[in-house]
UniProtKB/Swiss-Prot annotation:
GO-annotated cellular components: cytosol
Keyword entries, A-Z: Carbohydrate metabolism, Glycogen biosynthesis, Glycogen metabolism, Glycosyltransferase, Transferase
Catalytic activity: Transfers a segment of a (1->4)-alpha-D-glucan chain to a primary hydroxy group in a similar glucan chain
Superkingdom, taxonomy of origin: Bacteria
Gene (name only): glgB
Protein name (Swiss-Prot/TrEMBL): 1,4-alpha-glucan branching enzyme GlgB
Catalytic-site annotation from UniProt: D310, E363
GO molecular function per UniProt: 1,4-alpha-glucan branching enzyme activity; cation binding; hydrolase activity, hydrolyzing O-glycosyl compounds
Length: 632
């Protein structure tokens, strides 16, 4: 940012070049790229780019007729960095780097550090100043410093901005327009955070933002960087945190992007055959400076509250997505990518040092040990990890026909064997409602009513199981069709009673989650969870207790995964004056058939489930209920 650039020198210093070449210049975006600033009494734009193998680098754009003869950059030979100050060149101008490679080929490249880009399909960078936004989220940031996310509720609404809602003629809502509709909607549903699919500039809509060309440029599809600042600022002022998906594992192969930037493999190590992208080369210090600075950039400049790091498994393993014999083991003969491991640890150490209150979330799908373990204990240092095992087992189970479920009861119970091995987030994400996997509602067996009942049960299981929560947009309506990135959600479904009632159910359940300490106060170890009935595969019922620090905060959760009513179902409980049903998914308010348990439920001295006391309740088909003790 301009003020910080001018603090010492407006231009790159020798010390900063040294840090960059060592992989430790964590604010490289303040000097690399295009910066409108004052130098020697004149305003203009300063350019800096890393291209060590280039024979010549020029800046070209409309301002010089796309001819770089008069605007060649000076090379700092030892550092491989090229710089140039062009007096009088203002913000808003489009530009690219014209790079003459060692083989004599001339290529046009977008600026790796550009803050803004043309709207696709155009690919030029835009000179843009990130100054002059007045933030109003000071109270939010101050409060964030005092909070421990591991012992507080965290419920994220995952969203793809381009397909959440559109204008009547099918155009994207821009960042500023989303403020008036997205924030009240998320707030009304009771979510604590939104998690946004990648906003970094990308050429192809169908990549959902995961194949990036401009890591420092929020996509111009939805407006300007200042518009995005406004959206995040307003989220914070409304009490909503913002997490961004971040993709340091690979980048797209489009000609204007990072690939073969100076004619040589500069940012990339190899092709990711499975995804058709380039993998980053973590052995290069300058690539580490680029990527770690990028993470810092989003936390620093845009005030985001956390980063969800995409594709960590693909980074950690040398054989990821490769056939047998198509990869080389590391120096110890193993499959671990030691350079990627080193990068991740350096990344998390840096971010924890600069922003100790930021959330660092790993999408990691293997049994790698210590993903959320402390760095000083050989862990990777993430705050949370997506629990892909829980997600896979749960969605496999609920997709089974009712009779089959009896033989696969362990899919419900086995995830608790490792529920506290890491600090987990339970993800019902975008990846699970595309590519023929069906929507959450359509995964359910049974008729129309049973599908809704089953989904209410699943959602209750999701919200009451140990771990933080993430639900992809559309799951709260709920949609029958899969997510499609080229159109908005099926909002018309809210005209139908069952969808409207399910939407209200999600709202009520989120509110209960926020209120009930047992669901998050002891979310990180076994003292916060206890099985009551774990083996009832025949009836398809599980019963467990979630615990807070106080007995009066305890909750008893029962979920019936079979389409049968049980009129007198006995469960073992701790002694209390009685238990009150604080949620029943079969309530007619939620679209159920009304088989509930009103009033105070009497505790009896009948031993059951290894406890001295028990009570009887009515259990509805495919129903779930939450009971809370009342003291004498």
């Amino acid at each position: 940012m301009q003020s910080k650039i001018q603090k010492d020198s407006p231009l790159l210093t020798q010390e900063e070049m040294y840090l960059f070449n060592c992989g430790e210049f964590y604010y490289s975006y303040r000097k690399f790229g295009a910066h409108f600033l004052e130098h020697k009494g004149r305003w203009g734009t300063y350019f800096a780019v890393w291209a060590p193998q280039a024979r010549q680098v020029s800046v070209v754009g409309d301002f010089n007729g796309w001819c770089g003869m008069n605007h060649s950059l000076q090379k700092w030979e030892e550092q491989g960095i090229w710089t140039l100050f062009i007096p009088g060149l203002p913000t808003g101008e489009i530009y690219k780097y014209e790079i003459l490679t060692s083989s004599g080929e001339s290529v046009l490249k977008a600026d790796p550090y550009a803050f803004f880009s043309e709207v696709r399909p155009h690919t030029a960078s835009v000179i843009y100043s990130l100054e002059d936004y007045s933030w109003g989220d000071q109270a939010w940031l101050a409060q964030r410093k005092t909070r421990n996310p591991k012992v507080l509720p965290l419920s994220s609404y995952e969203i793809h901005l381009g397909s959440w809602r559109r204008t009547e003629d099918g155009r994207f809502l821009n960042y500023a327009q989303l403020v008036t509709v997205l924030i009240p909607y998320v707030k009304s549903l009771g979510y604590t955070h939104i998690e946004i699919l990648p906003l970094m500039e990308h050429p192809y809509d169908g990549s959902w933002g995961y194949q990036i060309t401009g890591f420092y440029a929020c996509t111009s599809r939805y407006g300007t960087p200042h518009d995005l600042m406004y959206l995040i600022d307003q989220c914070h002022q409304a009490g909503i945190g913002v997490i961004l998906d971040w993709v340091p594992g690979h980048f797209c192969m489009d000609a204007h992007g990072l690939g073969k930037f100076d004619g040589s493999p500069l940012y990339e190590r190899e092709v990711h055959e499975q995804w058709g992208t380039y993998k980053f080369d973590y052995s290069r210090s300058e690539v580490r400076s680029f990527l770690i600075s990028n993470a810092v950039f989003w936390l620093d400049v845009f005030h985001v509250d956390g980063l969800r790091v995409d594709g960590v498994s693909s980074m950690l393993y040398l054989d990821y997505g490769k056939a047998k014999g198509a990869w080389q083991p590391n120096r110890y003969g193993g499959r671990e990518n030691l350079e990627a491991v080193g990068f991740i640890k350096q990344l998390n150490a840096t971010l924890h040092g600069l922003y100790p209150d930021a959330l660092l979330i790993a999408e990691e799908a293997t049994d790698w040990q210590g993903v959320t373990g402390p760095l000083d204990q050989e862990g990777l240092g993430f705050t949370f990890k997506w629990n892909m095992g829980w997600m896979n087992d749960t969605l496999r189970y609920i997709g089974l026909d009712f009779p089959e479920r009896r033989s696969f009861h362990q899919l419900l119970t086995f995830p608790m064997m490792y529920a506290y091995a890491e600090s987990y987030i339970l993800p019902l994400s975008h990846d699970e409602v595309v590519h023929g996997k069906k929507s959450l509602l359509d995964k359910m067996p049974g008729d129309y009513g049973q599908k809704f009942a089953g989904l209410r049960g699943l959602t209750t299981y999701f919200m009451t199981s140990p771990g933080k929560k993430l639900l992809f947009m559309g799951g709260e309506i709920p949609q029958f069709i899969e997510w499609r990135e080229d159109r908005e959600l099926d909002w018309f479904l809210m005209d139908y009673e069952m969808h409207r009632k399910y939407h209200g159910f999600v709202q009520q359940l989120n509110g209960l989650y926020l209120r009930e300490k047992a669901l998050w106060e002891i979310d990180g170890d076994w003292t916060g969870f206890e099985w009551i009935d774990v083996h009832n595969h025949e009836q398809g019922v599980i019963v467990f207790c979630r615990k807070g620090k106080s007995f009066q905060d305890r909750l008893v959760v029962l979920i019936n995964f079979q389409p049968y009513n049980y009129e007198r179902y006995r469960i073992g409980v701790e002694m209390a004056k009685g238990y009150r049903e604080i949620l029943n998914t079969d309530s007619t308010d939620f679209g159920g058939w009304g088989m509930t348990n009103p009033g105070l439920l009497k505790v009896e001295g009948v031993p059951w489930h290894g406890r001295e006391f028990s009570l009887e309740i009515r259990v509805p088909a495919l129903g779930a209920m939450i009971l809370k003790p009342e003291l004498a």
